[in-house]
UniProtKB/Swiss-Prot annotation:
Protein function: Part of a membrane-bound complex that couples electron transfer with translocation of ions across the membrane. Required to maintain the reduced state of SoxR.
Membrane spanning stretches: 22-42, 63-83, 86-106, 125-145, 182-202
Superkingdom classification of source: Bacteria
Compartments in which it is found: Cell inner membrane
EC number: 7.-.-.-
Protein known as: Ion-translocating oxidoreductase complex subunit E
Catalytic class of the enzyme: translocase
Cellular compartments per GO CC: plasma membrane
Species the sequence originates in: Salmonella paratyphi A (strain AKU_12601)
NCBIfam families assigned to the protein according to its UniProt record, in alphabetical order: PRK12405.1 (NF009070), rnfE (TIGR01948)
Gene Ontology BP terms: electron transport chain
Subunit structure: The complex is composed of six subunits: RsxA, RsxB, RsxC, RsxD, RsxE and RsxG.
């Protein structure tokens, strides 16, 4: 149970691929102009990570070490192609918005890295959990950044959610404030870098506060030989 908890905590927070490892920055910065786009790409990446880790772990005993990386890339490319066709079939608007960044998941360092570092050494279900946790950690970072940029840039939240979730999701659109002209800095790549920097700073502050709290609540160590002395 402790191993499962550690995998989840590492993926979601301590070893977050976007906020700690800083992997996959190209799609993270390019696609997160809206919360819907960020959520769509994040969920697609999570699905790819989960299925890839599961497949790599299942086949690890029959994968020659000398050619393991090309085999991993072939597995990842197959999974990404399947996910791309699913998005094209059931969320065409999102497919058009994400564009080239769906097939680029194949080259994402997160996916290849987890296949090599974790899935090739652990069992299928733990590997699938690792992929899901890492993917949801990245999705959370994308969603927060996308929401921040959309609110500051357009004054809305979940604009275009129907392209991801269907026609009923139009009711999710919220207008935070009205603006006649968008705040371009938030919508362009410089705004994405600034937003990511703020998120990194907030995570650092939270981690530091948690360290101080643990240090304050930790019982003070008793030096050897002092036990029993008055």
């Amino acid at each position: 149970m402790s191993e499962i908890k550690d995998i989840v905590v590492q993926g979601l927070w301590k070893n977050n691929s976007a906020l700690v490892q800083l992997l996959g920055l190209c799609p993270l910065l390019a696609v997160t102009s809206t919360a819907t786009n960020a959520l769509g790409l994040g969920l697609a990446t999570t699905l790819v990570l989960t299925l890839t880790n599961l497949t790599v772990s299942t086949l690890r005993r029959w994968t020659p070490a000398e050619i393991r990386i090309p085999i991993y890339v072939m597995i990842i490319a197959s999974v990404v192609s399947a996910v791309q066709m699913l998005i094209n079939a059931y969320a065409f608007g999102l497919y058009q918005s994400l564009g080239i960044f769906i097939p680029l998941i194949v080259t994402n360092c997160i996916v290849v890295g987890r296949a090599e570092a974790f899935a090739a050494k652990k069992g299928p279900w733990l590997s699938a959990l690792d992929g899901f946790s890492i993917g949801m950690g990245a999705t959370g970072a994308m969603f927060v950044l996308g929401s921040l940029r959309e609110i500051l840039g357009n004054g809305t939240l979940f604009d275009g959610a129907d392209s991801l979730l269907g026609g009923w999701a139009k009711v999710l659109r919220v207008e935070i404030f009205h603006t006649d002209s968008p705040f371009l800095l938030a919508m362009l790549p410089p705004g994405a870098f600034i937003g990511l920097g703020l998120m990194l700073a907030v995570k650092y502050l939270i981690d530091e506060k948690m360290k101080k709290r643990r240090a304050e609540t930790a019982p003070s160590a008793v030096p050897a030989g002092e036990t029993g002395k008055v």
